[in-house]
Amino acid sequence: MPFTAALRLFRQVLLGAACFYATAAPAQTACPPGEQPICLGVCVCLPGSPRDTEAFYEQVQWLAAAGLETWIRQSRDRLALQESRPIPLHIRSQLESRFDLAVLETARYRVGDDAVLNAANTLLQHPDVTAVTLIDIIVFRNEADALDNGALWAHELKHVEQYLQWGVGEFARRYTRDHRSVERPAYALQIQIEREQTPATATGPRQ
């Protein structure tokens, strides 16, 4: 499937899944007996059982995960044809106690690919993406973060670690099912690094 078609399909399927999780419970009370809500952009009541509806949304979720995996792989392969750089040495030194060598050796980065970053705003359900990790290539929106933001690097390297541990398909499946559970450990590490880098003031540590 061409990249643009896969991107459009994933956006449509993701929208449907999001609408289901946001509106399914209210819609269930509005449907007549013997009918179930089907929500893809809008909700309609159709004949069927709760099991039929659950199976339908499992298929929707599978399609969404497949679309995300396709976007990740195709975007990464396109980026791999362009110049990328290893982790800056001072960033690597700062984080080497927190990651296995495989993560630090695998990860590379580049700066300012707007097509990838803007797509990630939608596909990764994040309104303001400052960096995105595509398997082993991290794309930063601005060079200052790439060169000096150790906390953001920690966040993105956590995703490199997840790709290595789970594989791309499983990463996409987990992210589609519950993106917060995938992002949570990355944000936790990012916040921890930020706090360690914040000097204590005369009145005590900054909260």
Give the label of every model feature segment.
Residues I137-A154, T176-D178:
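Short pre-active-site segment immediately N-terminal to the catalytic Zn-binding motif
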Residues T29, Q82-V132, I137, Q192, ...:
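Auxiliary, metal-adjacent structural segments of Zn-dependent hydrolase domains
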Residues P2-T70:
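N-terminal low-structure segments adjacent to metalloprotease catalytic domains
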Residues L157-R174:
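Catalytic Zn2+-binding segment of zinc metalloproteases
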Residues D178-Q207:
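Active-site or metal-binding loop neighborhoods of secreted/extracellular toxin and effector enzymes
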Residues T70-L81:
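Short, contiguous pre-domain boundary segments
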Residues L81-L89, R174-Y187:
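Active-site metal-coordination segments of metallo-dependent hydrolases
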